[in-house]
Amino acid sequence: MKRIHDTIIEEGTEDLPIQKKRTTVRAIIYKNKELLMVYSRDFQDFIFPGGGHKTGEDLIEALKRELMEELGAKSVTGITAYGLMKEKRFGLSDQHTVYLQTSYYYLCQVDDFGEQALEEREIAHGTEPVWISIDEAIKRNQIAIETNHHHKGMKTVLPREIIVLKDIKEYFNA
C-alpha cells in the first residue's frame, strides 16, 4: 500500500519513545463528486469513516465493522487499498502515552444503509454521516484546526485528513 505522506509528528512527541502502536482503517466513499464523511457537531470537523482495528480482525473485517457502526453500512463493496498515513501522537484518554498510529485508507462503496451503532462518545460529540465536496471538507477542516483542535492527541487528526483529502482530490481529478 502506498504511503500518502511522511509521518505527522505531534509537537512534544519528537524526542519521546513510542509506547504503543495503534492501527486504524478508514473508508474513502466517493459518489457524485462528494465524499461520505463523518461530521462532528462539537468539533465542527469532517473525518473519514472508520476507526480502530481489533485484535484478531483482518483490516477488511475491521473496515466493514467500523462502517456498520458509524454509517449503518449493511453492504460494503469494491474495497480497494488506497494508501496509509502514520502519526506519532499523544493518546486521547491517556495523554502521557505516545502512540504510533497507522491509518489504512480504502476506496469502497456503500449502497445499503441501516441503523448506526455509535459509541457513547460519538453520540456525545454529535457525529453524523454527511456527503460533502472535497474542497468544502478541506476548507471546513482548516477552520476547525484554527478554532477547535488544540487538545493533546487531537492535533494530528485534521492535518492527516486534509493531507488525504488533497491526495484524493488529485486522484479523482476533482
Positions of predicted regions on the chain:
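Acidic, metal-coordinating catalytic segment for phosphate/diphosphate chemistry
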Residues: 1-26
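A structural signal for short, well-ordered beta-strand segments
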Residues: 27, 81, 104-106
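Conserved Nudix-box catalytic region and its N-terminal flanking loop in Nudix hydrolases
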Residues: 30, 34-73
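Short, charged/polar surface micro-motifs in flexible loops or helix N-caps
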Residues: 33-35, 43-45, 54, 86-89, ...
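A short coil-to-beta-strand element that immediately follows conserved catalytic motifs
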Residues: 74-84
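Active-site-adjacent beta-strand/loop module that shapes the phosphate/pyrophosphate-binding cleft
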Residues: 88-117, 130
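Nudix hydrolase/Nudix homology domain
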Residues: 114-174
